[in-house]
Amino acid sequence: MGTARFLSAVLLLSVLLMVTFPALLSAEYHDGRVDICSLPSDSGDCLRFFEMWYFDGTTCTKFVYGGCGGNDNRFPTEKACMKRCAKA
C-alpha cells in the first residue's frame, strides 16, 4: 500500500507542476515577485459566469471568469485593470 500512495503523490505533484509551471514561465518578475499584469487570462476551474477584465500586455480586455481558481490578472472593472496594469 505504501508504494501505491507514493505513486499517487508523485502523479499529483507531476500534474500540479505541468499546470503551474507554464504560467510561471510566461510571467514577468519584478523584485522577485510575479508581475500579475503579465500573466495570461485564466477563466479558472468553476462554471459560473462573471465578466471580468485582464491585462493582455497592451490594454485591458473583457473575459469570462468561472468563479474559482485562475490567477491574479483579473479585475472587476476596466478602470481597476488600467489603474493596476497600464504604464503611464
From Swiss-Prot:
One of its GO terms (biological process) is envenomation resulting in negative regulation of voltage-gated potassium channel activity in another organism. Keywords: Disulfide bond, Protease inhibitor, Secreted, Serine protease inhibitor, Signal. Disulfide bonds join C37-C85, C46-C68, C60-C81. InterPro entries: Kunitz_BPTI, Kunitz_BPTI_sf, Prtase_inh_Kunz-CS, TFPI/VKTCI-like. It is found in: Secreted. Residues 37-85 form the BPTI/Kunitz inhibitor domain. Residues 1-27 form the signal peptide. Its main location: secreted. GO terms for molecular function: potassium channel regulator activity; serine-type endopeptidase inhibitor activity; toxin activity. It holds the Pfam family Kunitz_BPTI. The keyword Secreted applies. GO terms for cellular component: extracellular space. Residues 28-33 form a propeptide. Belongs to the venom Kunitz-type family. 03 (sub-Kunitz) subfamily. Serine protease inhibitor that inhibits trypsin at a molar ratio of 1:1. PANTHER family: KUNITZ-TYPE PROTEASE INHIBITOR-RELATED, TISSUE FACTOR PATHWAY INHIBITOR. Negative results: the recombinant protein does not show activity on Kv1.1/KCNA1, Kv1.2/KCNA2, Kv1.3/KCNA3, Kv2.1/KCNB1 and Kv4.3/KCND3 channels, as well as calcium (Cav) and sodium channels (Nav). It also does not show detectable activity against chymotrypsin, trypsin kallikrein, and thrombin. This is Kunitz-type U15-theraphotoxin-Hs1g. It comes from Cyriopagopus schmidti (Chinese bird spider).
